[in-house]
Amino acid sequence: MKFGGTSVGSPERIKSVARLVTRNGRPTFVVLSAMSGTTNELVEVADYLYKKNTNSANEVINALEQKYMGHVNALFDTEEYRTRMRQFLCEEFAFLRTFTKDFFTSFEEKQIVAQGEIISTTMMVNHLQETGVKAILLPALDFMRTDKNGEPAPGAIRERLTRLMEKNPGYEVYLTQGFICRNAYGEVDNLLRGGSDYTASLIGVALQAEEIQIWTDIDGMHNNDPRFVAHTEAVRQLHFEEASELAYFGAKILHPTCVQPAKYAGIPVRLKNTMDPDAEGTLINNELVRGKLKAVAAKDHIVAIKVKSSRKLGSPDFLRKVFETFEGYQTAIDMIATSEVGVSMTIDNVSHLAEIVEELKKYGTVTVDENMCIVCVVGDLDSANTGFENLATEALRHIPVRMISYGGSNFNISFLIREEDKQAALESLSATIFGKKKNEQA
């Protein structure tokens, strides 16, 4: 069971999660994020320290310490546990203050950011123990490992975690942190933000769990973005590939990396709502409902790049040179469309956009369109199921479409549009595919 920051965002929420993790009466492994807002505040501390602004860094640390001291009084009933937690927090925040006196690098930043999850898991395990639950904290730094490329190392994780579990049998609840780890050199490191979903999936696979549960503040994956479209509905079941597409193209409830380990191990993933724990949520497994469109998602901040080949370089290796340019800057391509004279691509990582464009100019005329958005329709879109692509394109007939990607996946058809047209596109797709008209959404 994995719980995100909003799920443990207050002492009351921590108590609710504690009840959830013990209600099935079976041994449970729990992955926790930092309490909501904490990681952002720790990143703020690191930013100040990079700028050598120790006074501002200390102000944030002091405010954070006061907030957590208040949480202790609300979360714990006995003086024994309150004293224990106050002592722990004093040591934690004293540790954070040591970074205001030393040379500061990305290594120190990772240690600072890691403390949010260390605090939340320590508070949770002590709360469980105070209420009589046999619980233990297994620090992620003892078993979560990444390789030299910064990717999780499943074999090393499984070996270390199995050894830890064998040394600590018989507990009702095992807890760990979500995105902190050690790299290939044994140094404290962090997975990308949102990586706690990935951690939960890797742990579930390592332990051969019956099910991996991701708990958030929404009732499963919805068939459209509820921030833009009213009266969306939770999708009760998704195939692993459908869930991957939705997560990659903008469904914030699930991190894209979470799905693949579970898919290969054949372990179902269930998305649940901590605010409404009895709601059905979304089940992700290997079952595919034939001939059905499941959901719509959108990905913002997309840049489209078009390269029109010059006659001189209009050779068979034109595409190879274009793709090698993106590979050289470790920039992934989301969508691609080719013609006899050129190629169009989209990216969302613009950290090397200027360099990429400059290099692409060697191979042809380059056009860049920013402030674009990818809208995707997900479901059983196998080529044998005719008509669904027409349904999607008909819904967007009044919206300028820059690119269409179809056929690279049996589960997704994607449209590149302007960001300003996003809401209209999502509403129209809901009306056409799911029968939710705009006047019903008001």
State the predicted function of each range.
Residues 8, 38-39, 145, 182-184, ...:
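Flexible loop/turn segments at secondary-structure boundaries
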Residues 1-254, 259, 418, 441-442:
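Nucleotide/pyrophosphate-binding catalytic subdomain
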Residues 280-442:
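A conserved regulatory-domain signal marking ACT and ACT-like small-molecule sensing domains
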Residues 27-30, 111, 134-136, 172-175, ...:
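Structural motif
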Residues 35-36, 218-220, 269, 273-278, ...:
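Glycine-rich beta-alpha junction loops
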Residues 239-285, 289-308:
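A conserved active-site cap/scaffold subdomain adjacent to cofactor or substrate pockets
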